[in-house]
Curated annotation (Swiss-Prot):
It holds the Pfam family ATP-synt_ab. This is ATP synthase subunit alpha. Its EC number is 7.1.2.2. It is a peripheral membrane protein. F-type ATPases have 2 components, CF(1) - the catalytic core - and CF(0) - the membrane proton channel. CF(1) has five subunits: alpha(3), beta(3), gamma(1), delta(1), epsilon(1). CF(0) has three main subunits: a(1), b(2) and c(9-12). The alpha and beta chains form an alternating ring which encloses part of the gamma chain. CF(1) is attached to CF(0) by a central stalk formed by the gamma and epsilon chains, while a peripheral stalk is formed by the delta and b chains. The keyword ATP-binding applies. It is an enzyme of class 7 (translocase). It comes from Corynebacterium urealyticum (strain ATCC 43042 / DSM 7109). Disulfide bonds: none annotated. Keywords: ATP synthesis, ATP-binding, Cell membrane, CF(1), Hydrogen ion transport, Ion transport, Membrane, Nucleotide-binding, Translocase, Transport.
Length: 545
């Protein structure tokens, strides 16, 4: 058996190597203890150094956001299943403020307000982190809004135009088509996306707050069927989610949009709707025992929306010239725009599109009340061609509404008033559009210009929309040069106007109304007078046998 020898030098060397590589460390962790947990709110004792909006970790991987920072306790909004929490549970600080992953791979996906995919299509890779609560761009970082954000809806693009970087409120009662207006705006960006031109492409973010899960699934299907999902991200906080998720969802959409905006890209964010976010924030504030104010909303509910919507901007060229356009939706009750939340958001935004239930029930869709709707950016957000053809449209419609109200009491109207009424009826009909069928700027310009020139005056009201659709198809085939000339909203030339007039006259000759009569009838033949007829006498000679 071999003899075991131990060298003291080897032992000394091994001990020296171990001690040189060892660095004594002491980990320090600040923890707290749950005192109460109910209704999505947890009160935690301890953690005197916790930060506002810091993420806290509960047992089972549940996270929360620190909100109330009292001297001896912290009020935490729990994000996730709070029913598993109980008194005495240990809570750990993370040292991080609430943030979400962002990146190009979020396009075409459905995520929750924490940036986690919920569409069953796997994890999202190659991402960066961005804080949810970010300071809005300063005044010096911005430039005036001067690029149009085409919605594809004539009534909006012509009279209440939206620009890239603008905040335009969509407001109205429930079931008046607010979501449809916003979805059509997303669908209208498809041609820009397919062009491949970064200066035209618009990335869209649809934030669904407090909606039914089936409604969100239906919207996703609509976007997919129309080829719009590839440039759209859906941030979903359905009605089944806790109030904390509904409160944070708009900030998640804004953080994702700002990531692209600071890269010099153009983004459209739709918040559907901020009324439900305000209600969720009210519930959180009351559970945190913050003092209530008007309509039981907390005192900082205005700041909740202002700091969110101020993140929409058109950056200056030094920062890349990117933009973030916001379309917040607010639901009113009985068309009452003087309620607390509607007046708050109206004062924050750069204009509003007001949808009325009365117009909707009359078949005017989109049900936009032109008199109340306004865009504070105005013509700066329009192309030169659209600005030129739509200059008198709002005035014509306003005059028609006044005359319509007057005609209800007046028995006799002069010919000029009757003509104005008839043209107004056709303008209202012309501004109606089918859902999910946005129109190009060239289509809109041609329709509005021809209506202003009186080309629709002899078309029966019930045939106006069919006449317009068939006329546009006819013009695409027989006057395609006009579409090329006004592409992108360039003003009409005199040659284009003459060609439009001629092609429209040709089309009218072959167009038949619903009852089968042509618009342009051939003049009836006039009976000839007796002295205008010359007859030769015919003499028949009959031989007798």
């Amino acid at each position: 058996m071999a003899e075991l020898t131990i060298s003291s030098d080897e032992i000394r060397s091994a001990i020296a190597n171990y001690t040189s590589s060892y660095s004594p460390e002491a980990s320090r962790e600040e923890v707290g203890v749950v005192t109460t947990a109910a209704d999505g709110i947890a009160n935690v004792s301890g953690m005197p150094s916790v930060m506002a909006n810091e993420l806290l970790e509960f047992p089972g991987g549940v996270i929360g956001v620190a909100q109330n920072l009292d001297t001896d306790s912290v009020g935490v909004v729990v994000l996730g299943n709070y029913e598993t929490l109980k008194e005495g549970d240990e809570v750990k600080r993370t040292g991080e403020v609430l943030s979400i992953p962002v990146g190009e791979n979020f396009l075409g996906r459905v995520i929750n307000p924490l940036g986690e995919p919920i569409d069953g299509l796997g994890d999202i890779t190659d991402t960066e982190e961005r804080a949810l609560e970010l300071q809005a761009p300063s005044v010096l970082m911005r430039q005036p809004v001067n690029e149009p954000m085409q919605t594809g809806i004539k009534a909006i693009d012509a009279m209440t135009p939206i620009g890239r970087g603008q905040r335009q409120l969509i407001i109205g009662d429930r079931k008046t088509g607010k979501t449809s207006v916003c979805i059509d705006t997303i669908l209208n960006q498809r041609d820009n996306w397919e062009s491949g031109d970064p200066s035209k492409q618009v990335r869209c973010i649809y934030v669904a707050i407090g909606q039914k899960g089936s409604t969100i699934a239906s919207i996703r299907q609509t976007l997919e069927e129309h080829g719009a999902l590839e440039y759209t991200t859906i941030v979903a906080a359905p009605a089944s989610d806790s109030a904390g998720f509904k409160w944070l969802a708009p900030f998640a959409g804004a953080a994702l949009g700002q990531h692209w905006m600071y890269q010099g890209k153009h983004v459209l964010v739709i918040y559907d709707d901020l009324t439900k976010q305000a209600e969720a924030y009210r519930a959180i504030s009351l559970l945190l025992r913050r003092p209530p104010g008007r309509e039981a909303y907390p005192g900082d509910v205005f700041y909740l929306h202002s700091r969110l919507l101020e993140r929409a901007a058109k950056l200056n060229d030094e920062l890349g010239g990117g933009s973030l356009t916001a379309l917040p939706i607010i639901e009113t009750k009985a068309n009452d725009v003087s309620a607390f939340i509607p007046t708050n958001v109206i004062s924050i935004t750069d204009g509003q599109v007001f949808l009325e239930s009365d117009l909707f029930n009359q078949g005017v869709r989109p049900a936009i009340n032109v008199g109340v709707s306004v865009s504070r950016v105005g013509g700066d957000a329009q192309t030169k061609g659209m600005k030129k053809v739509s200059g008198n449209l709002r005035l014509d419609l306003a005059a028609y509404r006044d005359l319509e109200a007057f005609s209800a009491f007046a028995s006799d109207l002069d010919d000029a008033s009757k003509a104005q009424l008839e043209r107004g009826e056709r303008l209202v009909e012309l501004l109606k559009q089918t859902e999910h069928a946005p129109q190009s700027v060239e289509h809109q310009m041609i329709s509005i210009w021809l209506a202003g020139e009186g080309e629709f005056d002899d078309v029966p009201v019930e045939d106006v929309r069919r006449f317009e659709a068939e006329l546009i198809e006819h013009l695409r085939s027989n006057a395609s040069g006009v579409f090329d000339q006004i592409a992108g909203g360039t003003p009409f030339t005199e040659e284009s106007q003459a060609q439009l007039k001629q092609s429209t006259s040709e089309f009218k000759r072959g167009f038949q109304t619903t009852d089968g009569t042509p618009i342009i009838r051939e003049p009836e033949a006039r009976a000839m007078e007796q002295d205008e007829v010359k007859q030769s006498e015919i003499t028949v000679t009959r031989k007798t046998v």
